[in-house]
């Protein structure tokens, strides 16, 4: 085993260790080292999933914080507590700085290493979907021209992923389904296009249902889970009380159908 291979193996092991300890920032660092190894070529499915899980947890914690703080900010604004609102805005902007930094980190890695080195259709869709996801996370909190740019970048990445997925991946493939799930969430939440969101989600669900009997045992669980999430969102979006925003919109959470 060459020194590079040994160090790659060690970083993967350390990333798994960090995951067990729920130290996701360090998990990101270990997996970035693996991804940046010059002669690495394409990441294995396991490595790709570890990288995805690491970033998912790091960004997920901040996204949850941002939503909570934004909700409190709205309540205080409606009560007219201007002094509190100013403090909340400042605190929210600190979280937004962290969110921007995390998104910029993975987007740079995707552009410099992961997307260019991807050869298999599955890998290309996985990374382009990931690229769309992190641009979408930027669009969630940016405003004005920055939000417009983030939304445009999201659309381009998801469309590129979709073109490959429709041509080369089975309708029941967890990554293809995860892409449809997150792409539809983007249409609904960021572009405010409920019709397009519903059409995309329904098409993906119906196409997969038609081919369900061809599913292998290993991906059956992943695929049916994402199909359930597609259906949950469709139910939420088409119901009369969709406007109340009481229920949480579902996104792909597992790396095989990665996203969220």
UniProtKB/Swiss-Prot annotation:
Annotated region Disordered: the residues are 241-260
Q: Which GO terms describe its biological process?
A: protein localization; signal transduction
Give me the Gene Ontology terms describing cellular component: cytoplasm; nucleus
One Pfam match, given by its short name, reads 14-3-3
Segments of skewed composition (Basic and acidic residues): 247-260
Q: What induces it?
A: By wounding, drought and salt stresses, benzothiadiazole (BTH), ethephon, methyl jasmonate (MeJa), hydrogen peroxide, abscisic acid (ABA) and incompatible and compatible races of rice blast fungus (M.grisea).
Q: What subcellular locations does the record give?
A: Cytoplasm; Nucleus
Task: Name the source's superkingdom.
Answer: Eukaryota
User: InterPro entries, alphabetically?
Assistant: 14-3-3, 14-3-3_CS, 14-3-3_dom_sf, 14-3-3_domain
Q: Which SMART domains match?
A: 14_3_3 (SM00101)
What keywords are assigned to this protein? Cytoplasm, Nucleus
Query: Its family?
Result: Belongs to the 14-3-3 family.
The protein, known as: 14-3-3-like protein GF14-F
Q: Which gene encodes it?
A: GF14F
